[in-house]
Amino acid sequence: MSRRKQPDSPLFPFQPPVPDFAFERAAQRDGLWPVAGADEAGRGPLAGPVVAAAVILNPDAIPTGLNDSKLLTAEQRETLFEEILATATVSIASSSSARIDTTDILKASLDAMRRAVHGLEVAARIVLVDGRDVPPGLSCHAKAIVKGDSRSVSIAAASIVAKVTRDRMMARADATFPLYGFAHHAGYATVKHRTAIESHGPCSLHRMSFRPFRQL
């Protein structure tokens, strides 16, 4: 009995989900409006702050192409960043590497998100948060959404704002600490970054509580 040869690739290749406004509309039906999205950038790097953003989109002026910032090119993120700032209510907060070292990265991230939400000029009735954890101490309702930056346009917008803001901060830090190449890797554990740390030791932006530095 002959067997049909299987195709080399699926007939219907996987397409990542595209964020929409469904969570926001559901909250509105429950009487919770305005709705903010919140996300952070920079949990994983060896250096620099973790940056959080909270965004309340204008439902009549949602920028086209919003998605998880990790799925976008730097050019796409920069363009959407400017569109978000021009059309939405935005607040940004950060926790420094020193703050991360005195607490931990999760607490520092959630605290930055809490401050970003509370910094909004328009008070949100509910905040949609990327991930499994809700920042403690919020003055509004909150809903954690796993992979929320690919499911909610509000969270996607927040992820873009946080990512672009942090990348710009690390590019500026490169001028102060030129030995580490922060403008190229934003503090992530690339080979170039690890080599620079081995050659020059850590600087004040490095997270000394992270594993590579614990033995120093």
From Swiss-Prot:
PANTHER family: RIBONUCLEASE H2 SUBUNIT A (PTHR10954), RIBONUCLEASE HII (PTHR10954:SF18). Manganese or magnesium. Binds 1 divalent metal ion per monomer in the absence of substrate. May bind a second metal ion after substrate binding. Its EC number is 3.1.26.4. Endonuclease that specifically degrades the RNA of RNA-DNA hybrids. GO terms for molecular function: manganese ion binding; RNA binding; RNA-DNA hybrid ribonuclease activity. It is an enzyme of class 3 (hydrolase). It catalyses: Endonucleolytic cleavage to 5'-phosphomonoester. It comes from Sinorhizobium medicae (strain WSM419). This is Ribonuclease HII. Its cofactor is Mn(2+); Mg(2+). GO terms for cellular component: cytoplasm; ribonuclease H2 complex. Keywords: Cytoplasm, Endonuclease, Hydrolase, Manganese, Metal-binding, Nuclease. Belongs to the RNase HII family. A divalent metal cation binds at residues 39-40, 130. GO terms for biological process: DNA replication, removal of RNA primer; mismatch repair. It is found in: Cytoplasm.
